[in-house]
Amino acid sequence: EILIGLVGSEMCIRDRLKGVEVVAQKPLVKVDVDKIEYNIEDDPDSKSNSILEMLRKVPLVTVDGEDNVQVNGSSSFKIHVNGKPNNMMSNNPKEVLKSMPANTIKYIEVITSPGAKYDAEGIGGILNIVTVGSGFEGYTATFRGNANNNGVGAGTYAMVKQGKLTVSANYNYNYNNSPRSYSDSYRENYEPDKENEKYLESESSSKSKGNFQYGNLEASYEIDTLRLLTVAFGMYGSSDKSNSDGNTIMHGADRQDFAYRYRTDNHGKGSWYSINGNIDYQRTSRKNKERMITFSYKINSQPQTNDSYNTYLDIEPDENKLDIIKELSLKNFHSDGKTNTMEQTFQVDYTTPIGKLHTIETGAKYIFRRNSSDNRFYEAEGASENYAYNENRSSEYRHLNHILSAYAGYTLKYKGFTFKPGLRYEQTIQEVKYLVGPGENFDSNFSDLVPSVSLGIKLGKTQNLRGGYNMRIWRPGIWNLNPYFDNQNPMFISQGNPNLKSEKSHSFDLSYSSFTSKFNINLSLRHSFNNNGIERISRLITDKDGEIFEGGHKAPYGALYSTYGNIGKSRETGLNFYLNWNASPKTRIYVNGRGNYSDLRSPAQELHNYGWNASAYGGIQQTLPGKVRLSLNGGGSTPRISLQGKGSGYSYYSLGLSRSFLKEERLSLNIYCSNVLEKYRTYNNHTEGANFISKSSSKYPSRYYGFSISYRLGELKASVKKAARSIDNDDVKGGGGGGNTGGGGGQ
C-alpha cells in the first residue's frame, strides 16, 4: 500500500520541543493494488458537506452539475456500505448520497479492479462507503444538528462496548423544502407532410418537500478468540409530496398559428425505502490467524410507491377539442404505482495463506431476488374526477432471479510485487410472469465465466505502478425491464423492455502513484469496450394515425417514444489524475480531474456519436489563526455525449469555515455556502434522431448556505468488530431509478 494526500488542518503528531510544536498531517488517500481509499473522516469539509459533495474530491469519481455520479467515467457502478452491497443506493445514488451527511462516514473505497470474489457486475467499479467507528473501544455519543436554506436536519451516533459485546447505532433525519424548479423543451419535426404540426414547445415548473431518514444498528459478539458473530440492521429512505404545472403548444411551420395547446396540473406523493439485515459468522484458524471461513446471510427489501393525479386544462382550439382529446388521449388520470425488490443471499467464503508469499481465497453464493411491479391506472372522462380502472393501461408482473456463483482467487506478494488473478462462474435463471397488462411469461437461463487479473509493483519507496484487466457484466434492473407504458406526458412516452439481456464490458487499466512530503500524485489510464450495451433509444412517432403498442397502448403522431435495448457498442478511453500539494503544515491544495474520449455506436439504429469530455475539481484548505479552518473549492465540466446527443457543462464553487471548541475538540461549529451568486442554474440537453431534433433545459435551485453543530461526549476507544468477509451483491444495473412507472425516466 502507498499513502498519498495529506490534510492540512488535522494534527496527528505533536511533539513539543523547547516550546516549538512540530506538526505532521494525516494521509487522506491510500492506494492498493486494486483500489483507492479516500479518508472522509480526516477531511474538515466532512463536518458540513453531504457524501455527494465529498465524492467530488475522491479520485476516479466525478459528480456533474446535475449531481449525477460516475466512477471511472461510467454511470454503471455499484455502491456498498461497510462491505455489503446496497441496491437502493446503486439505483438512486443522486437522491440518497446528497441526503446523507458526510460526518457519518469514515472513508470511501473506489474498487477499480474488482477481483473474483466480487459479483461480476459493475462496469465502472465499486464504491464502498465505510461508516465511522472502526478501531476504537469504550463508549461515545455524538449529537448533530444543521439548518440551511432548504431545510433542517439532526442526527446521532452512539456506541457502547461491554465485555465481548459491542453495539453501535446511527440515526439521521433531514427535512427538505426546496425552491421551485423550472424546465422547458423544444422539438422540431422533420416530417414533410405535417407542416401544421412542426414545432412542439413545452414549459413546466415543479416543487417538492419531504423527509429523508437513515439509520443502522450493528452488534458483534466475540464468542472466543477464534469465533466472531456479527449482526446488523439498517434502513433509509424518503417520502415526499410534489406538485407541478405545465403548458404545451404545437406550432405550424410558420410559427404563427398553433395546431393545439393545453395546460397540465399534477400533484402526488411518493416514497422509497431500503430495509436490510445480515448476520455473519467468522471462524479463524487457531494455527494461522489469516486462515478463516465465513458464513453469511442477508435479506433486503426495497419498497417504493408513487400516487399521482394529472389533470388537463384549457385545451384549445375549442372547435377541435374532442378530436385533440381523442388523438392525444388527454384524459384526466390517477396513477398508483408500487414496486418492490426482495432479496435473500446465502454465502460462504474461505481464505488461507500458503507459506509467506501466497494466499488462496474461494467461495460460493446463492441469491434469490424477486422484483415485483404493480402499476394501476385510472381514467376520468372529460373534465370529471370519476376515475375508472383501465386494465389495458395498467401493468403488474413478477421477475424472479436465481443466481448461483463460485469463485477462486490467488494472491502472490513478493517484496514490492503483487499479483492477483481470479476466475468467477455465474449462472442466472430468470422467470418473468405477467399478471396484468401486455407481455407473455418467459424463462431464460444463461451463464458467464468472468476472469480478472491485477498486479502492482513498488518502484522504490515512494512510487507504485498498478495494472489490471476485468470483465464485468450488467443485468438490467427493474426500471429497464418494466413494460409499463408511461404516457403521463402524451408527447414524451417511455416504456421498459422485458426482453433485455445482460451487457458485458471489458476494461484495462494502468495507474501510477508517487508521493513525497510535499507533492502527491495519482494517474490512472483506462480503456473499456462493450458490444451489447443497454442504451435508451428515442424515436419519433411518424404515422399520422399514431402507433399502437402491445396491450392497446397508443402513441399519437409526433410523440417521442423512448425505451431500452441491447443496441450499444462503446469504446471509451479516459485519464484520471489526482494531485495534492502540501504547501505548508497548515495549507493543502488539491486537484481531482478526468479527461475522457467516447465513441458510441448502434449499427442497428444507424446511430453514431463521439467526442471528448473533461472535468476538474480542486480546492484549498487552510488553517487560519485561532484554529479556524477555511475550505475553498470549485470545479466544472465540459458537456458529456450520449448515443443520441449531449448534455450540458457545469461549474461549481463552495466556501466553508469551521472551528472546534472545548477539551478534545468535543464541540464543532461549521458554516458553509455554495454557488451564492446565482439562485438558479440552467442545464441543457440535446437529442437527435433521423427525423427530429429535441432540446431541453432545466433550471434548478443553485444557491445553498447553512450551518451545522455537533457535540461529542464519552470516551471512544474501540468499535464494532466486524467479520472480515461478508456479502457483496453487485449484480443489478443501476442508475435507472427515481420513478415508479418503470420504463424510463420521462422528459
Task: Annotate the PLM regions.
Residues 21-46, 69-80, 84:
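N-terminal periplasmic "start-of-domain" segments of outer-membrane beta-barrel proteins
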Residues 214-222, 226-238, 266-433, 458, ...:
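Face-selective signature of the C-terminal outer-membrane beta-barrel domain
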Residues 429-431, 461-506, 527-556, 676-690:
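Surface-exposed extracellular loop regions of Gram-negative outer-membrane beta-barrel proteins
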Residues 2-13:
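Single conserved hydrophobic/aromatic residue that forms the stacking wall/gate
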Residues 9-10, 19, 23, 51-54, ...:
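N-terminal periplasmic accessory domains that precede
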Residues 343-347, 388-395, 495-497, 501, ...:
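Outer membrane beta-barrel strand-and-loop segments of large Gram-negative receptors
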Residues 120-127, 135-185, 209-213:
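Outer-membrane beta-barrel translocator/receptor signature
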Residues 51, 57, 84-112:
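Short acidic/polar hinge/loop motifs at secondary-structure boundaries
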